[in-house]
């Protein structure tokens, strides 16, 4: 490329240099309006360096890990990952990765530094899942530095190992809690059909949905009563104070069979919702899904250009209910019902375990729960219950005899 040049034009200074030829013709690049020659040289030097680096504002061999993480976040995370994942990664970068690695050059970061950090997180008492997820964030960033960006030759995270981290008995009990029939019956007795939490609870129990997926069901478009199916194609998620329909985690859109008992619950809800529309008239709040996934609500007498939907959970007057409200339900179960192990995800664990202990094939359970692989299903969502152990003994006895 040509050398940087400066010249005075009137009362101001301009920098210029020759860019790559286009169709065999010269491609001069310039910018003016600087008060002094020194200002023009400084700005021109920066512009030429950025041009020579194909628009990058840094030299890959010199960039710090801190600046690279910012670059990766702006150019990959914001473009390709969901809002909630963006927020999660932003926090992991700010709280964990920059303090640990930000001062190093990207090109000099090696596995031993990463391994010391992992071991340090264990000593500080972080859970295995926290260590694993934070390392995954770093590995994802460095993986893109290898390919497609080719800033470094290999990913040093590939050779790091997470040591054995023993889960406390309390944490293990919470994670592996299965909501047995007696516990669920007590919950439904407290939050019966007239409660706003009845349908989300029954949806988690009958369909094994994530909490956001349960609240993301549209009764107008996602339920097929003729085929006895429900399609899980959205999760209701909060982005900057607004609610959106977004694809499920891992894009795990799926259509699953539902029981007559659950169908009856949904039919009753649709019937009651229509009755309330007539009862409230113009004061009923209708719900719409906009083109960008935004969930928008307006009085029924206001015409909105958007897809009208019927959220599975709403107040009597149609106002949207969200996963945030479920915190109250969990609090009541903990304190009033004396069940501190309950959490919204346990209904998903319960669903998978009930299927497995009654003979459902692992692949069927995996697809019903919307997992990306069977290992996740069997390791984290299907627990070895006493019934399974007893069944195994019966099978063994039959085989031996």
Each predicted region: which residue ranges?
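Short, Arg/Lys-rich segments that mark the N-terminal edge of DNA/RNA- and chromatin-recognition modules
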Residues: 1-33, 229, 234, 241
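Conserved tyrosine-mediated DNA breakage-rejoining catalytic core shared by Y-recombinases
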Residues: 16, 162, 217-293, 297-301
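N-terminal core-binding DNA-recognition domain of tyrosine site-specific recombinases/integrases
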Residues: 32, 58-61, 73-147, 319-325, ...
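A short, basic/aromatic helix-end/turn motif that makes direct DNA contacts
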Residues: 32, 216-223, 366-372, 380-382
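N-terminal helical hairpins
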Residues: 32-62, 79
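Short, basic (Lys/Arg/His-rich) helix/loop patches that form interaction surfaces
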Residues: 124, 189-194, 207, 256, ...
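Basic, Lys/Arg- and aromatic-enriched nucleic-acid-binding interface segment
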Residues: 128, 132, 136-137, 148, ...
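Catalytic-site neighborhood detector that most strongly recognizes the C-terminal catalytic loop/helix
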Residues: 236, 369-395
């Amino acid at each position: 490329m040509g050398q940087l040049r400066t010249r005075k034009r009137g009362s101001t200074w301009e920098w210029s240099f020759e860019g790559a030829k286009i169709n065999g013709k010269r491609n001069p690049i310039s910018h003016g309006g600087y008060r002094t020659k020194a200002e023009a040289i400084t700005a021109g030097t920066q512009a030429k360096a950025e041009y020579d680096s194909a628009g990058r504002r840094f030299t890959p061999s010199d960039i710090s890990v801190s600046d690279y993480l910012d670059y990766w976040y702006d150019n990959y995370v914001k473009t390709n990952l969901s809002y909630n994942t963006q927020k999660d990664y932003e926090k992991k970068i700010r709280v964990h990765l920059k303090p640990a690695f930000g001062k190093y050059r990207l090109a000099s970061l090696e596995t031993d530094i990463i391994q010391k950090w992992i071991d340090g997180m264990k000593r500080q008492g972080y859970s295995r899942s926290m260590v694993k997820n934070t390392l995954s964030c770093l590995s994802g960033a460095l993986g893109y530095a290898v390919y497609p960006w080719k800033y470094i030759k290999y990913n040093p995270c590939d050779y790091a190992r997470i040591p054995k981290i023993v889960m406390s008995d309390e944490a293990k009990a919470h994670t592996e809690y299965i909501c047995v029939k007696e516990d669920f019956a007590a919950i439904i007795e407290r939050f019966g059909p007239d409660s706003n939490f009845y349908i989300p609870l029954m949806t988690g129990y009958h369909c094994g949905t994530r909490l956001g997926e349960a609240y993301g069901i549209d009764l107008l478009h996602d339920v097929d009563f003729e085929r006895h199916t429900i399609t899980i194609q959205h999760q209701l998620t909060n982005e900057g104070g607004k609610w959106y329909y977004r694809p499920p985690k891992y894009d795990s859109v799926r259509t699953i069979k539902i029981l007559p008992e659950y169908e009856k619950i949904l039919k009753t809800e649709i019937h009651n919702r229509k009755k309330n529309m007539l009862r409230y008239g113009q004061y009923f709040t209708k719900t719409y899904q906009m083109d960008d996934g935004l969930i928008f609500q307006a009085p029924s007498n206001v015409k909105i250009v958007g897809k009208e939907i019927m959220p599975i959970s709403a107040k009597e007057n149609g106002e949207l209910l969200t996963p945030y409200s479920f915190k109250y339900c969990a609090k009541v179960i903990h304190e009033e019902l004396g069940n501190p192990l309950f959490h919204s995800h346990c209904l998903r664990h319960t669903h998978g375990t009930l299927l497995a202990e009654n003979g459902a094939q692992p692949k069927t359970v995996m697809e019903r729960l919307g997992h990306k692989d069977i290992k996740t299903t069997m390791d984290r969502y299907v627990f070895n219950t006493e019934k399974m152990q007893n069944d195994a003994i019966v099978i063994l006895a039959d085989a031996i005899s």
